[in-house]
Amino acid sequence: MAFKIKTFLSIKSHKIFYTDFYFFLKKKLIILIKNIFPEYFNFNNKYKNWNLICLPDFLYFKVNNTHFLDNVQYINSLIKIFLPLKFQNLKTNQIFFKNLLIFELPKYNSHNYCYLNGLKKIFISKYFTSNGIFFHKYLKRKYDIYYAKILLTNSNFFNIVLDLKLKQIYLSIKNLKFNFILFLYYLGINNKDILKYSRYKKSKILKLLIFTALQTNLINNKKFILKNLNYLKSIFKVTNLNKNYKHFIINKNKLNYNYGNFNKNNFLTIDFIFILDLLLDLQSKKLCFKNIDHLDNKHINTIGNYFQHNFKFYLKKFISIIPNLIKLKKFSLLKVYNFKELLILNPLIQYLEQINSFSELTHKYKLNNYNSSLKGILNLREICLNQIGKLCLIDTTEGINCGLIVNFAKHIRIYKKGIIQIYVSPVFKNKTKEFINFKTSLDQELYLIQFNNINLRKNKLFNENIKVVYNKNNFRIKFISNKKSFLLKFADLFSFTENLIPFIKYNDPARCLMGAKMQSQSVPLLNKKKSFVVTGYEKEIITKSDITIKALQEGIVLNASSLKIHIKDLFNREIVYYLSKYKKSNQNTLIHQKPLVWNGERVFTNQLLTQHQDIIDSEFAIGNNLLIYYGNFCGYDFEDAVIGSKRVLYQQLFSSLHMDIYEFNFGYNNENDIEFSTLEIPKQSYYIKKSLDSLGIVKEGEKILTGNILLTKIKVTKPNYTYKSIFKLIYSIFGKTIRNIKDNSLYIQTGKNGRVSKIELFLINTNSHYKTYNNSYLKCRIFICKQRFLTVGDKLCGRYGNKGILSYIAENADLPFLQNSFYPDIIVGALGIPSRMNLGQLFEALVGKIGFSYNIRILPSFTSSSNAYFNYLKILIYNFLMFNNLKKGFNWLYNFNLPGKFLIRDGRTGIKLKSSVLCGVSRYSKLIHMIKDKLHFRTTGPYTEILQQPLKGKKNLGGQRFGEMEIWALEAFGASYNLKEILNYKSDDCFARNNLKDYLLFRNSELQNSTITESFRVILKEFNGLILNLELFLITDDLEENYLNLTINY
């Protein structure tokens, strides 16, 4: 199948997983119930005799109506599965039908997520080893042992082991081990059949194996087989093999390519003999091994397969307890299995990352690359050559799951049975065709796969015909003048995350991985700009993302507002698209959509109708272009610390919006005991109630501070008097009945300041089946939008893994400046570039400076570098700088001695500095790890018993924890007392603590200096355990007999 490149926008489509889920419900679930459920259930008791018949062919589903479902409340609709049952009374011959509710599952929508507990959750795909034959080799007693592992569909497997030292071949199933030749006799295969169908009928090795089976092990193995005959029949009986044999030797075309001819019409006779021949081929080194982790031997598990696997367990459990669940008089179900709990506990079903539209896209295309058994997990972490074009070579998770959780490549297609296909362009006579072809791993190894931009020599004629190609799972250098080959582009080796890095070739791959992760962790900004240096894939990301609204049909826009868009399509149908306004993501960032079309505009299929908060002109833009100096300033740029200017703060270049939601209910016990909201609350002044409306709810658009009231809630109850005479006396004095008033108003906590953006009120239907709160009649939800400015302690990052903590915000007048009076936006230390091999950020700074000077955007093209070879980028940058110098008329813009560097002056004195610095324009963004979320305080709290350190985390009332980059920022700022407390006294000094307590309480001892902390004492014990001794000696002056001062900080 061929497609034009212009119209091809294929990736792991959501429709595959969406249709697979519903195909399981419509087809596979019926087959599963038929296989597991017995056809008849007989219930006999003293009074009635009943016969129960299951009717899985009439299985039907029911989804919640929109009357009960409110999309605003993020309540996911449930799919109810009903099993029709037929009841028959054997005495009276009475027959009636009953629909039995057996399961409830959350609805899985076409965007590859479902709602659980009000939050979006996504299913991560998983690789599973396909059923079939796998060959292995291991060393035992200095001899090679060859064996074939055969995996069946029911997860059973057995091994056929060839041991030439013992001169035998045997079959092993779990703990059973017996001769393979005798096993063939058991299947009805005699010596004549073995010699007839085997290719080694004249070989001495095969005759030796038959002879040893007959002479040495005949009696013992025959008794052993007869003893375990029932177990063998349960595995190899014909009824089981008829079901399993379709996948027993899976995909015989694959095995024909790898190992030879498998007869498709035969059952087991020739196939087992052929496996014997393959083991002998491997022993004689006529064939090479195929790794079990090869992508040919794996398939992708979808959510339909996940439910199918778990339904087997629940259906079997359901059968065992179905007599107790059904009451014969009422015929009602007492217990329903809800799969919501199963989806919450599964580690592959995770909360969707919604920091920005890019993070949501990358999270959906993750892949679990290992099975439940973690054997050989070190080999799985490595990059296999067969993953080229299918899995990203760089993108993976960090930590213990490194190499196990990977991402799909940019352009792939999921084919039948979960097989990955890549697209390649055919090349003939060094000309790339317009059409593309899809190739699997098998097809990929049959043809020659070229990679562009790989030049072996400087001679052009040599590079035209001799190329580096990928063939038969290896890289080769071949002459391909007239041979048919295919081209795999450089961008198709990576996922979307890496393709957003412009100069990825000039960076360390580990830093590229870090830069890709940080782009998905960047916060959408209020004042964002498109970068001067682009890669060309910014618009393609938006077409793949589901966070924007795309047109389903071609039509004319009737009405476009901030709430909804009306479109009339070609069939005169009216389609309404509702926009998300001021919604909260899973990471508390703001989701806000704006319309891109106007009234009367003609829209086409898959055209963008809205834009997100991180989209500008249908292009992903999440940062700002900043003028950067690579140098130092008063030591504030220590290690990776960043110095910012006040201009960045005043112009709000890194200001972001975040959302908090407060949700509460109004309940009741009876008519006289009810909660309500009112403006007349006791013991509160007018100043506190000025932001409330007449109902006692905060007004929309109000600015709220710490201690303000969001909503008033009062509960009035009648007092209980034991004596009615006292109640009458109080009524006669005051003239009113006395009531107990309890104030349950909601106040703003510290650090939660913001502005009320939206208020939602919901009436709770007390008669509804989907009632979520007991004794509640009203639910109120208040959205508070917070604007966070750039502060000291926030983390800034670029696109190349370069990140740092903002350590100081300086005045513009104090910063060094260029000869045209340009002040830098941020100053970054230059020592981190060569040590981390981050040359890409230097190229981006220089090319961005050119784009800033000419007011243009630059797309670096690496495909045209074949003419200039390795000097292409250097020539490009030098020419741009020189032309910029000639156009502006300033000689200082291009220094012939130091190209790309500029002389600067000190902003405080105006004196020209001795050294020159590299100055450029690069894109920076703000990460979600902000200082307001990190800082928390405590006066007292729990400590660990051994190290005497504060516990970790806010949940445990732990102490403040500082990371490596936070320490660098403190060192740059010169916070010596904080550093001493963090580094030296992070663990308490028990002796000094007790001395301080005695001094403050009893005054019976003098206050002494601090000694060694408890954690340092633990380190000393660890050294002693390693037979190392650490001692401290004082140096003395022998002439004056005085101790010399020795200051040591532990």
Curated annotation (Swiss-Prot):
The keyword Nucleotidyltransferase applies. It catalyses: RNA(n) + a ribonucleoside 5'-triphosphate = RNA(n+1) + diphosphate. Keywords: Apicoplast, DNA-directed RNA polymerase, Nucleotidyltransferase, Plastid, Transcription, Transferase. GO terms for molecular function: DNA binding; DNA-directed RNA polymerase activity; ribonucleoside binding. Gene3D superfamilies: 2.40.50.100, 2.40.50.150, 3.90.1100.10, DNA-directed RNA polymerase, beta subunit, external 1 domain, DNA-directed RNA polymerase, subunit 2, domain 6, RNA polymerase alpha subunit dimerisation domain, RNA polymerase Rpb2, domain 2. Its main location: plastid. The keyword Signal does not apply. Pfam families: RNA_pol_Rpb2_3, RNA_pol_Rpb2_6, RNA_pol_Rpb2_7. Belongs to the RNA polymerase beta chain family. In plastids the minimal PEP RNA polymerase catalytic core is composed of four subunits: alpha, beta, beta', and beta''. When a (nuclear-encoded) sigma factor is associated with the core the holoenzyme is formed, which can initiate transcription (Potential). This is DNA-directed RNA polymerase subunit beta. It comes from Neospora caninum (Coccidian parasite).
